[in-house]
Amino acid sequence: MVKELEVNKLRYTCDPSSFEFKTTADLEPLDQIIGQERAIEALKLGLGIKDVKNRYNIYVAGGPGTGKMSAVEHFLSRSSADEPRPPDLCYVHNFDTPYTPKYIELPAGRGCELRTDFEQHIQRLKREIPKAFESDEFKARSKKINEKHGEKRTTLLEQMEQKSRELGFTIQRTPIGINTLPLSDSGEPLSQEEYDGLPEDKRDEIRTRQGEVQSLIQEHLQEVAHLDEARETEIKELAKEAVLFMIKPSFDQMRGRYEGLDRVIEFIDAVQKDIVENLDAFRGNGQAKKSPFPFPMPQADPFKQYTVNVLVDNSKADGAPVVVEQNATYPNLFGAIERRVQMGVAITDFSMIKPGSLHRANGGYLVLNANNLFRLGLSWEALKIAIKRREIRIEDPMQMMGYSATEGLRPEPVPFRIKLVIIGSSYIYELLHHYDEDFAKLFNVKADFGTEMERTAEHEQAMARFLAACCSQEPSVLPFDPSGVAKMIEYATELTGDQTKLSCEFGSLVSIVKEAAYWARTENSDHVTGEHVTRALNERDFRHDRIDAKIREMITRGTIFVDTEGESAGQVNGLAVLQMGDYAFGKPSRITASVHAGKGGLIDIEREAKLGGKTHTKGIMILKGFLGERFAQERPLSFAASLAFEQSYSMIDGDSASSTELYAILSALADLPIRQGLAVTGSVNQKGHVQPIGGVNQKIEGFYRVCKAKGLTGDQGVLIPAANVENLMLCEEVVEAVETGQFHVYPIATIEEGIELLTGVSAGERDDEGSYPEDTVFGRVVSRLEQIHETMKASAKNDDEDAKKDKTENNENEGKDTPEDDDPNKS
């Protein structure tokens, strides 16, 4: 007979005396990642490889609360501190193609310097350039040019008037043009009456000569216009010469300050050239022209094109930047080009370009959240393009998606120099590998964070330092004494479901740390003890166990049928785990088996009702294999049996109840009652070995609570797979009940051990002839199967005899003459 488990195997207990501190306040806070050696090595590799093709980006995989973000920030801060600061990034006006602003990269801190230099320089030029036009030399040379062209202009006009008089016309200037008037013989202009009184042939002659005069005037006016243009050109060239002479030294000085920065020098040259070519804004002191409309019109700033838009200022950076983007929308990643509305029209310019995370992280590291990034398909597709092209391009999202949009700026793309780190689940990683062919090419490093680590003395001491770190980071968290640390370590072991492991789900641990500190404060304690941790865990269970308590109430009141006393054949208490968010609990269920003569074999009622999953169906098929090997070596199995989870109305899956179902079948076949004070969990293989399952602690505790609610008898307990013993981390109440003999836990390795414990009857072993003793469970099963076989055989024989009798009677009836056969009139 199987012996129940010893108390010391039901739960790992951490000894507070193994810690040599008074409270965690005496410890150095943990400043490193523990239990994630594999992931740490992957991070070192990914951060250490500098690939010009941007293929060694990192995907950090793992469950929530495993310290992924903390580890990434820790390593990135160390790695970035040893790297040089990236350059500042600026955008400036493109004087050749204004809709394509140019980028400029400068050493860290010099972007703002360049902006300030240009602001001050333009302000100085706005004051100094007008003075160039007020100088005596400029005025004298301008006067000389004006006089030279004025004389030529006067000469041309005099020639025009003289030739007009020779043709018999005089010229009259008006505000709207020039009139030609015919002259009389006396040299006076003809009046309209005098002209009308002339003979027709005389008038025709005047009109002919008038056409010649107008052509003459047109020719001379064109020459005058050319003279005016030449004068304006000379004046402009003089102005350019004067301004260039004035501003060149200051621009040369700027070139000297930015020597070696080719893009800056190009911009300085372009600004100098544009100022010289467009002096009107400076001559008018930058004042807007008077609007021709009766209301004020917005005017463009003529000096904005000489400013510098600093997108990224790395003057205060220590090493390479580390940017964490929690909301990876397209504008947040790639930046945006803002617009403002004037008179109903959206306008923009280079000064309205705003940076994205990629710009701020350029030359360093960008950390993204996978759940957020991959919900935003546009962001992911654009990011892949940026990595492959190795450039950061700001585009209109509507245009990128193929929708029509107003043509706007297309800033020159910036070189892409970023190491990407995406943090997400292993599930997303597998999906990307399967469905996105680019992902594997661009993310060659996977840092896989596990949920557990080995429970060693070193890790237990590190856990104490982790609690010290929690206290230092959270003012509301009190220090833990050794008993409190021990309870937290036990809880960390409990989370893993393995006595040899500690949980790496630090998020879950921190929640209990804060709650335990809260309960300590309510008792006016200056530190957290083991009792406070226990209370925090109990209070959390109380907040979450409403459904669990309701199910126990229904079992206690008899609404749900679960027996915890007595015996019954073909009926076993199975155990399942229900997961309600972050709270899991065990629920006992009655499993019954009904056996009768027939050829239906093993019928799974859950499967027939379409309430059973594939894994559960597999477990039922395994039962058929076990029964066939044990009891069908000499004759086929000739019985029908049905299995059911009683009062189950939802989907059932998993094979953890397959051993329980097998016990129910064996009990029904052997007609041996099973102890109802025992519950069973564990899967079984075709050889009868009981295999480990999940949720063993919740299942045991769930049945214990039901037994406690209905009344503990001292005979109650749970059969678990022997392979699950190392997974036991039962609550202290259950451990105490086992210690006092009120409850029991039995490790089962084979079906034989389990059926013997449940029925109190030996399972039985085959003798030399291959038969089981009649007074054993298997012997009784064989007897029942033989009985059913004989019954089926007799039934089949009777069916054959009845069939033969029916056939004989039919033949005899066919041989007799009928009245119709004797009818002489029948042809």
Task: Label the predicted regions.
Residues 1-433, 438-456, 460, 464-482, ...:
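Conserved ASCE/P-loop NTPase catalytic core
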Residues 16, 349-358, 364-377, 381-383, ...:
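Peripheral, non-AAA+ core regions of ATP-driven protein-machinery
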